[in-house]
Amino acid sequence: MREKFLTFLAFSLFILPFPFFSGCGPFWVDPYITVKESSLNWVAIHYYNMSRQPIRRIGVEIYGTGTVLVKKGTSELVSNDFAKRSKDANWGNIKTYRIQIDPQAANDIFQNLVNYGVLDREKTGKSSKKEVTDRFIAVKANLSNNTYSDNVNMFEEDPDLAEQLLDVVREFEHPSR
C-alpha cells in the first residue's frame, strides 16, 4: 500500500506544474522580426517642432493596406483626435491628406523601422546622448502582432531611430497632387 501511495505521490508531483506552465513561453520577444505583410500592421509617428510658436505638428499614420494618413498644422487635433481645447485660436489649423501607396512599400517602411529598433524596448533609455532638444518625435506601432507605444521623445532616447522616423515624416510631409 505504501509503495502505491509513493508512486501516486511522485506522479502527482511530476504532473502538478503542468497546468501552471501550459501556454507559457518566454516573456521576451525578439524585437528584430521579419515583418509579414498584413492589413493589421500600422505605425503612427508624431513630430513637433517646438522652436516656433505656435508649435508646428505633423502626424503620419501608415497602415498595412498602403493607406497613409498625414495631418499637419498647429492644432492639437493633429496629434490628438480627442483634444478638448476647441476655443484655442489654432483649433482649426489642420490639414489632412490621405495617400495610397503599394502595401509592399508600406511593409518595406515597417521593416526598415524594425531594423532600426522601433520594437526594441531594451534599446530606448540607454542612449548616452541625452540632449534636450526643441524637437519631439514619438512612435506607436503594431507590426506582426508586436507593439510599441511608449510616448517618449526619440530624439533624446534613440537619436538614430529618431532620424529614421523623421525621414518617414519628410517622405510624406508634402504630398504631390
Report residues per predicted region.
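Short, well-ordered, aromatic-rich surface patches in folded extracellular/luminal domains
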Residues: C24-R52, L119-R177
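Glycine-rich catalytic cores of cysteine/serine-nucleophile enzymes that process amide/ester linkages
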Residues: R52-G92
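Bacterial N-terminal signal peptides that target proteins for export
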Residues: M1-L9
